[in-house]
Amino acid sequence: YVDGRGNLTPSEGTFKFLEDIFNRTITVQPDDVLPLFGILERYNRITNNDFIVASSFTYIINSKSQFFERNFSQLRFKIEGAGSLLNALTATYKVVNTEGSTKNKLFGVEYAQYAKAEVDFIKHFPIGKQSSLAFRSFLGVAIPYGNSDNIPFSQSYFAGGTTDNRGWKAYRLGPGASGSILDYNEANMKITLNLEYRFPILGALKGALFTDVGNIWNVADDTR
Protein backbone atom coordinates (compact mmCIF):
# COMPACT_ATOMS: atom_id res chain seq x y z
CA TYR A 1 0.00 0.00 0.00
CA VAL A 2 2.50 2.51 -1.28
CA ASP A 3 2.40 5.24 -3.90
CA GLY A 4 4.44 5.38 -7.11
CA ARG A 5 7.48 6.54 -5.15
CA GLY A 6 7.32 3.68 -2.70
CA ASN A 7 6.01 5.83 0.17
CA LEU A 8 3.31 4.60 2.52
CA THR A 9 -0.09 6.26 2.03
CA PRO A 10 -1.84 5.99 5.42
CA SER A 11 -5.28 7.21 4.33
CA GLU A 12 -5.60 5.56 0.90
CA GLY A 13 -3.61 2.55 2.04
CA THR A 14 -6.01 1.92 4.90
CA PHE A 15 -9.03 1.90 2.60
CA LYS A 16 -7.30 -0.30 0.03
CA PHE A 17 -6.36 -2.70 2.80
CA LEU A 18 -9.96 -2.83 4.07
CA GLU A 19 -11.27 -3.19 0.52
CA ASP A 20 -8.96 -6.15 -0.10
CA ILE A 21 -10.18 -7.79 3.10
CA PHE A 22 -13.86 -7.33 2.29
CA ASN A 23 -13.23 -8.59 -1.26
CA ARG A 24 -11.38 -11.57 0.27
CA THR A 25 -8.19 -10.71 -1.60
CA ILE A 26 -6.49 -10.88 1.80
CA THR A 27 -7.37 -13.62 4.26
CA VAL A 28 -7.74 -12.66 7.92
CA GLN A 29 -9.03 -14.46 10.98
CA PRO A 30 -12.83 -14.20 11.47
CA ASP A 31 -12.33 -12.52 14.85
CA ASP A 32 -10.40 -9.71 13.14
CA VAL A 33 -13.11 -8.81 10.63
CA LEU A 34 -15.45 -7.10 13.12
CA PRO A 35 -12.86 -4.60 14.47
CA LEU A 36 -11.78 -3.79 10.91
CA PHE A 37 -15.37 -3.18 9.89
CA GLY A 38 -15.68 -0.92 12.94
CA ILE A 39 -12.81 1.23 11.64
CA LEU A 40 -14.61 1.80 8.35
CA GLU A 41 -17.96 2.40 10.03
CA ARG A 42 -16.43 4.90 12.45
CA TYR A 43 -14.72 6.79 9.64
CA ASN A 44 -17.92 7.03 7.60
CA ARG A 45 -19.89 8.31 10.60
CA ILE A 46 -17.39 10.93 11.77
CA THR A 47 -16.55 12.30 8.30
CA ASN A 48 -20.09 12.30 6.91
CA ASN A 49 -21.07 15.63 5.32
CA ASP A 50 -24.06 17.36 6.94
CA PHE A 51 -25.74 20.61 5.91
CA ILE A 52 -27.34 22.08 9.05
CA VAL A 53 -29.54 25.17 9.21
CA ALA A 54 -31.00 25.32 12.71
CA SER A 55 -32.62 27.74 15.12
CA SER A 56 -32.81 27.33 18.89
CA PHE A 57 -34.40 28.91 21.95
CA THR A 58 -32.82 28.73 25.42
CA TYR A 59 -34.48 29.80 28.67
CA ILE A 60 -32.46 29.92 31.92
CA ILE A 61 -33.69 30.46 35.48
CA ASN A 62 -30.79 31.15 37.88
CA SER A 63 -31.14 32.06 41.56
CA LYS A 64 -27.49 33.10 41.90
CA SER A 65 -27.13 36.77 42.86
CA GLN A 66 -23.40 36.87 43.68
CA PHE A 67 -20.41 35.30 41.93
CA PHE A 68 -19.19 33.35 44.98
CA GLU A 69 -22.64 32.41 46.26
CA ARG A 70 -22.68 28.80 47.52
CA ASN A 71 -26.42 28.23 47.73
CA PHE A 72 -28.06 28.52 44.33
CA SER A 73 -29.91 26.61 41.63
CA GLN A 74 -30.20 26.85 37.86
CA LEU A 75 -32.76 25.43 35.46
CA ARG A 76 -32.11 25.53 31.71
CA PHE A 77 -34.48 24.63 28.89
CA LYS A 78 -33.43 24.46 25.25
CA ILE A 79 -35.35 23.56 22.11
CA GLU A 80 -33.82 23.39 18.64
CA GLY A 81 -35.13 22.64 15.19
CA ALA A 82 -33.27 22.08 11.93
CA GLY A 83 -34.25 21.56 8.32
CA SER A 84 -37.88 22.70 8.35
CA LEU A 85 -37.13 25.96 6.53
CA LEU A 86 -35.02 24.20 3.91
CA ASN A 87 -37.68 21.54 3.49
CA ALA A 88 -40.32 24.22 2.91
CA LEU A 89 -38.11 26.00 0.38
CA THR A 90 -37.37 22.83 -1.57
CA ALA A 91 -41.09 22.02 -1.64
CA THR A 92 -42.11 25.56 -2.63
CA TYR A 93 -39.58 25.92 -5.42
CA LYS A 94 -39.86 22.24 -6.40
CA VAL A 95 -36.16 21.53 -6.14
CA VAL A 96 -35.62 18.25 -8.00
CA ASN A 97 -32.93 15.81 -6.93
CA THR A 98 -31.36 14.55 -10.13
CA GLU A 99 -29.00 12.09 -8.43
CA GLY A 100 -31.62 9.42 -7.83
CA SER A 101 -31.49 9.77 -4.04
CA THR A 102 -34.63 9.85 -1.93
CA LYS A 103 -33.14 12.69 0.16
CA ASN A 104 -33.22 16.37 -0.77
CA LYS A 105 -29.85 18.06 -1.20
CA LEU A 106 -28.45 21.58 -1.29
CA PHE A 107 -25.02 22.17 -2.83
CA GLY A 108 -24.75 18.42 -3.25
CA VAL A 109 -25.15 17.70 0.49
CA GLU A 110 -28.19 16.26 2.25
CA TYR A 111 -29.56 18.78 4.74
CA ALA A 112 -30.29 17.63 8.29
CA GLN A 113 -33.83 17.70 9.65
CA TYR A 114 -34.42 17.07 13.35
CA ALA A 115 -36.05 18.34 16.54
CA LYS A 116 -34.03 18.58 19.75
CA ALA A 117 -34.95 19.33 23.37
CA GLU A 118 -32.84 19.56 26.54
CA VAL A 119 -33.45 20.25 30.21
CA ASP A 120 -30.60 20.78 32.69
CA PHE A 121 -30.97 21.34 36.45
CA ILE A 122 -28.13 22.31 38.83
CA LYS A 123 -28.35 22.74 42.60
CA HIS A 124 -25.52 23.78 44.96
CA PHE A 125 -26.01 24.14 48.70
CA PRO A 126 -23.54 24.52 51.59
CA ILE A 127 -22.87 21.93 54.28
CA GLY A 128 -21.08 23.73 57.08
CA LYS A 129 -18.75 26.67 56.49
CA GLN A 130 -16.55 25.26 53.72
CA SER A 131 -18.15 22.05 52.47
CA SER A 132 -20.92 21.89 49.90
CA LEU A 133 -23.07 19.47 47.93
CA ALA A 134 -23.55 19.83 44.17
CA PHE A 135 -26.25 18.07 42.16
CA ARG A 136 -26.83 18.07 38.41
CA SER A 137 -29.34 16.32 36.19
CA PHE A 138 -29.54 16.39 32.40
CA LEU A 139 -32.00 15.02 29.87
CA GLY A 140 -31.59 15.55 26.15
CA VAL A 141 -33.15 13.98 23.07
CA ALA A 142 -32.85 14.73 19.36
CA ILE A 143 -35.28 13.07 16.94
CA PRO A 144 -34.54 12.92 13.19
CA TYR A 145 -37.43 13.13 10.74
CA GLY A 146 -38.23 14.05 7.16
CA ASN A 147 -34.97 14.36 5.27
CA SER A 148 -32.86 12.64 7.97
CA ASP A 149 -32.68 9.10 9.28
CA ASN A 150 -30.17 9.93 12.01
CA ILE A 151 -28.77 12.87 13.94
CA PRO A 152 -25.58 14.53 12.62
CA PHE A 153 -22.50 13.49 14.57
CA SER A 154 -21.89 17.08 15.74
CA GLN A 155 -25.40 17.26 17.25
CA SER A 156 -25.42 13.83 18.92
CA TYR A 157 -24.73 13.05 22.59
CA PHE A 158 -21.82 11.19 24.15
CA ALA A 159 -21.09 9.92 27.65
CA GLY A 160 -17.91 9.86 29.69
CA GLY A 161 -15.21 12.43 30.30
CA THR A 162 -14.13 14.75 33.10
CA THR A 163 -17.50 16.50 33.50
CA ASP A 164 -19.79 13.55 32.84
CA ASN A 165 -19.62 9.87 33.79
CA ARG A 166 -16.09 10.13 35.11
CA GLY A 167 -15.48 6.38 35.26
CA TRP A 168 -15.16 6.35 31.46
CA LYS A 169 -13.21 8.30 28.89
CA ALA A 170 -15.21 10.57 26.60
CA TYR A 171 -17.17 8.66 23.93
CA ARG A 172 -16.40 5.25 25.52
CA LEU A 173 -19.68 4.66 27.39
CA GLY A 174 -22.86 3.44 25.67
CA PRO A 175 -25.05 3.40 23.74
CA GLY A 176 -27.36 1.65 26.15
CA ALA A 177 -29.69 0.25 23.49
CA SER A 178 -27.24 -0.61 20.73
CA GLY A 179 -24.66 -3.22 19.88
CA SER A 180 -22.24 -0.60 18.62
CA ILE A 181 -18.64 -1.65 18.02
CA LEU A 182 -17.36 1.89 17.62
CA ASP A 183 -14.70 3.54 19.77
CA TYR A 184 -16.61 6.83 19.45
CA ASN A 185 -19.98 5.92 20.93
CA GLU A 186 -22.72 8.49 20.42
CA ALA A 187 -26.50 8.47 20.34
CA ASN A 188 -29.50 10.78 20.15
CA MET A 189 -30.74 10.57 23.76
CA LYS A 190 -28.90 11.12 27.03
CA ILE A 191 -29.78 10.98 30.72
CA THR A 192 -27.23 11.94 33.39
CA LEU A 193 -27.33 12.41 37.18
CA ASN A 194 -24.32 13.70 39.14
CA LEU A 195 -23.94 14.16 42.90
CA GLU A 196 -20.73 15.59 44.38
CA TYR A 197 -19.62 16.34 47.94
CA ARG A 198 -16.87 18.99 48.05
CA PHE A 199 -14.75 19.54 51.15
CA PRO A 200 -11.51 21.25 52.23
CA ILE A 201 -8.34 19.21 52.83
CA LEU A 202 -5.53 21.64 53.60
CA GLY A 203 -5.47 25.34 52.79
CA ALA A 204 -6.36 25.85 49.14
CA LEU A 205 -6.36 22.09 48.51
CA LYS A 206 -9.89 20.77 48.10
CA GLY A 207 -11.30 17.27 47.73
CA ALA A 208 -14.48 15.75 46.36
CA LEU A 209 -16.48 12.53 46.57
CA PHE A 210 -18.85 11.97 43.68
CA THR A 211 -21.19 9.52 42.02
CA ASP A 212 -22.25 9.66 38.38
CA VAL A 213 -25.18 7.80 36.84
CA GLY A 214 -26.25 7.92 33.21
CA ASN A 215 -25.93 6.64 29.68
CA ILE A 216 -26.86 7.36 26.08
CA TRP A 217 -29.42 5.58 23.91
CA ASN A 218 -30.50 5.42 20.28
CA VAL A 219 -34.20 6.26 20.03
CA ALA A 220 -35.95 6.58 16.64
CA ASP A 221 -32.51 6.82 15.05
CA ASP A 222 -30.91 4.30 12.67
CA THR A 223 -27.31 4.95 13.83
CA ARG A 224 -25.54 1.74 14.90
Per-region residue spans from a language model:
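Surface-exposed, low-complexity/disordered segments
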Residues: 1-54, 63-64, 68
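C-terminal transmembrane beta-barrel domains of outer membrane proteins
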Residues: 1-2, 9-10, 41, 54, ...
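Phosphate/ATP-binding catalytic cores across multiple sugar-kinase/actin-like superfamilies
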Residues: 58, 62, 196-197
